[in-house]
Every structure is written in structure tokens, then in C-alpha cells.
């Protein structure tokens, strides 16, 4: 069953996910995960927030990186990410130049490393990402 993607928008939600320190840095992105909080959440919803800092470049570069990450998440998360967690995807400089297929592999590997990969897909995910904290 495909989960529904919702967005994290409030700063407090981003800080809560970051405070848990459950993260994995892949060459193309950083993924953070935390148990979802809130009473209005549906059991099959995934909440995802995106952030790209000014280190990545000007606003054109940051928005391009954010668009690439949003599309990768839309492709990977409904089938592979565990529901009941909030996720924050952080863009890096490499997000812009990294081939899209490798960005998808980075996302799958990061899901596996933070323990958020659905059990049915755990055997399929590559473990190619190297830790960079």
C-alpha cells in the first residue's frame, strides 16, 4: 500500500526531527528521521520536509536542488519508506551535479541506514553510501 506524502512546514517540526539525531549522510543528501508526532496524522501518511542551505549556492541552485530532492522522494518514499515517521531531507552541493539514478540510490541507502526502510524492501536497498558527518 502506497503511503501518502505530506509536508513538514513548521520550524518546530524540523528542530524536533534534528534533535533526535537519527540521520545518515550520503554523497547527494542527508536524511533525518524521527517518530511522527501530532494527533491529526493518518496511519499511512509520511511527512517530509526539505531544506537546502546557502552553502549550496544562490537561490536558483538551491531551488533546483530542492526540486530534484522532491522528485526523488516522490519516487522512492511511497513504496519504500516506513509510515509513522517524519523525515527531513537536506540538500548538499553534490545534489546538483549527482546523476539522478545515484541520487535515488543515495536516498534508498539512507532510508536503510536510519532504519526507515519498509521491511518488505530491506533486501533490495543498496548499501553504497558512506558516512559523512
From Swiss-Prot:
Domain of life per record: Bacteria
Biological-process GO terms, alphabetical: tRNA 5'-leader removal
Name of one Pfam family that matches: Ribonuclease_P
Keyword RNA-binding: yes
Catalysed reactions, semicolon-separated: Endonucleolytic cleavage of RNA, removing 5'-extranucleotides from tRNA precursor
Top-tier EC class: hydrolase
Name the record gives this protein: Ribonuclease P protein component
Amino acid at each position: 500500500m502506497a503511503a501518502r506524502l505530506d509536508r513538514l512546514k513548521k520550524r518546530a517540526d524540523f528542530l524536533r526531527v534534528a534533535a533526535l539525531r537519527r540521520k545518515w549522510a550520503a554523497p547527494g543528501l542527508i536524511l533525518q528521521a524521527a517518530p511522527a508526532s501530532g494527533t491529526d496524522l493518518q496511519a499511512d501518511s509520511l511527512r517530509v520536509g526539505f531544506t537546502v542551505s546557502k552553502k549550496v549556492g544562490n537561490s536558483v541552485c538551491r531551488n533546483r536542488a530542492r526540486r530534484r530532492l522532491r522528485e526523488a522522494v516522490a519516487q522512492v518514499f511511497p513504496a519504500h519508506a516506513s509510515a509513522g515517521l517524519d523525515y527531513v531531507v537536506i540538500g548538499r552541493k553534490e545534489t546538483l551535479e549527482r546523476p539522478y539514478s545515484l541520487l535515488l540510490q543515495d536516498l534508498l541507502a539512507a532510508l536503510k541506514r536510519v532504519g526507515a526502510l519498509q521491511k518488505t524492501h530491506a533486501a533490495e536497498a543498496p548499501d553504497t553510501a558512506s558516512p559523512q558527518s
